[in-house]
């Protein structure tokens, strides 16, 4: 089995974190985003994975060598000399994706969910047509492109309606697909969109189906969604009774959904939760309050600080009695002074903040 992950460009929406690492390597719940996806593909029997990128991927190549060995898989980088949108990368990787008759998976690198690849493969083989897209149900379909089925058919797609004014359905494209290699004949090697060009052609030939995703789904490509996705992921681990979570019986855990790396140090009289992820080698002082936040590797939160709806970047320090909230994001190695208030600040790497940030701003 084969899979292609659409990684794309520089991850500008997730800056300042992506100024330090490519977006797929940023840790989501203490594991790089791309590793969540690679593990799910491997579990479904995938042995060849292509990462479609449009910049030199040296950092990722080095990082992923370990996982090639660990899972006995082959990871190749398909580097676009010009951005090829969402369908062009499939054609560029035709040598691998089309090397045999078996179907292949395609997914966006920003999507987090309970990846249903095994079930998707079974469903796809059962209907026997060219492609299947995973769809998720949303409460406000008018913000999205909606998938509409053929009358009298539970899964065959009839059309797509972009940001519908009146209700036509509530299923949207979840950014995960499975195709037979014959789809590659439909795609030219140029910048071309899978959603706007390839899918309508498949629909016209009655060759495209949808598969309903159960459970949570989030595109975590920007900070507010990264935090929301963290909450959804931790809640799903709680539902499954996962051992990855810190037991709610720990005196500092409040409201559950807390994941703390074993190497992190937690001070006295802290209140942590709900929805908090603490990475390796993090140091949390005494009397700290953490809620709906992510502390990345090597960061420090000093005594009595309050951190809410915030991503604290690698090796950053939050001072005593400081208060961070409202989707604040600290890049790598940022220092927030004692008693400083940051309201929705996006702070670039290596900065030191000595004055309050009262309104959301980018601090360069």
Swiss-Prot record:
It holds the Pfam family NTP_transferase. GO terms for molecular function: GTP binding; mannose-1-phosphate guanylyltransferase (GTP) activity. One of its GO terms (biological process) is protein glycosylation. It is found in: Cytoplasm. Involved in cell wall synthesis where it is required for glycosylation. Involved in cell cycle progression through cell-size checkpoint. This is Mannose-1-phosphate guanyltransferase. GO terms for cellular component: cytoplasm. PANTHER family: SUGAR-1-PHOSPHATE GUANYL TRANSFERASE. The lineage of its organism: Eukaryota, Fungi, Dikarya, Ascomycota, Pezizomycotina. Pathway: Nucleotide-sugar biosynthesis; GDP-alpha-D-mannose biosynthesis; GDP-alpha-D-mannose from alpha-D-mannose 1-phosphate (GTP route): step 1/1. Keywords: Cell cycle, Cytoplasm, GTP-binding, Nucleotide-binding, Nucleotidyltransferase, Transferase. Its main location: cytoplasm. The gene is mpg1. Belongs to the transferase hexapeptide repeat family. It catalyses: alpha-D-mannose 1-phosphate + GTP + H(+) = GDP-alpha-D-mannose + diphosphate. The keyword GTP-binding applies. Its EC number is 2.7.7.13.
């Amino acid at each position: 089995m084969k899979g292609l992950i659409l990684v794309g460009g520089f991850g500008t929406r997730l800056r300042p974190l992506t100024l330090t690492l490519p977006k797929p390597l940023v840790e989501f719940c203490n594991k790089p985003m791309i590793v969540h996806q690679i593990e799910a593909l491997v579990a479904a029997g995938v042995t060849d994975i292509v990462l479609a990128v449009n910049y030199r991927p040296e950092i990722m190549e080095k990082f992923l060598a370990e996982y090639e060995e660990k899972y006995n898989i082959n990871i190749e980088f398909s580097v676009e000399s010009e951005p090829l949108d969402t369908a062009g990368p499939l054609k560029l990787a035709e040598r691998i994706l089309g090397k045999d008759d078996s179907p292949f998976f395609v997914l966006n690198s920003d999507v987090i969910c309970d990846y249903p690849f095994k079930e998707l493969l079974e469903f796809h083989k059962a209907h026997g047509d060219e492609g299947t897209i995973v769809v998720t149900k949303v409460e406000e379909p008018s913000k999205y492109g909606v998938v509409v089925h053929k009358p009298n058919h539970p899964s065959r797609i009839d059309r797509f309606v972009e940001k519908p004014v009146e209700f036509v359905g509530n299923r949207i494209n979840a950014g995960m697909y499975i195709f037979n290699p014959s789809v590659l004949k439909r795609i030219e090697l140029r910048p071309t969109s899978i959603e706007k060009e390839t899918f309508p052609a498949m629909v016209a030939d009655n060759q495209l189906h949808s598969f309903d995703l159960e459970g949570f789904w989030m595109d975590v490509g920007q900070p507010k969604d990264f935090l929301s996705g963290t909450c959804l992921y931790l809640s799903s681990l709680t539902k499954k009774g996962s051992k990855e979570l810190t037991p709610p019986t720990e005196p500092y855990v409040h409201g559950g959904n807390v994941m703390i790396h074993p190497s992190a140090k937690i001070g006295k009289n802290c209140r942590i939760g709900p929805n908090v992820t603490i990475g390796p080698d993090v140091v949390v002082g005494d009397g700290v309050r953490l809620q709906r936040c992510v502390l990345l590797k090597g960061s420090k939160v000093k005594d009595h600080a309050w951190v809410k709806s915030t991503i604290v970047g690698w090796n950053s320090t939050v001072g005593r009695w400081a208060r961070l909230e409202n989707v604040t994001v600290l890049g790598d190695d940022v220092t927030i002074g004692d008693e400083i208030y940051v309201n929705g600040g996006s702070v670039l790497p290596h900065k030191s903040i000595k004055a309050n940030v009262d309104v959301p701003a980018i601090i360069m």
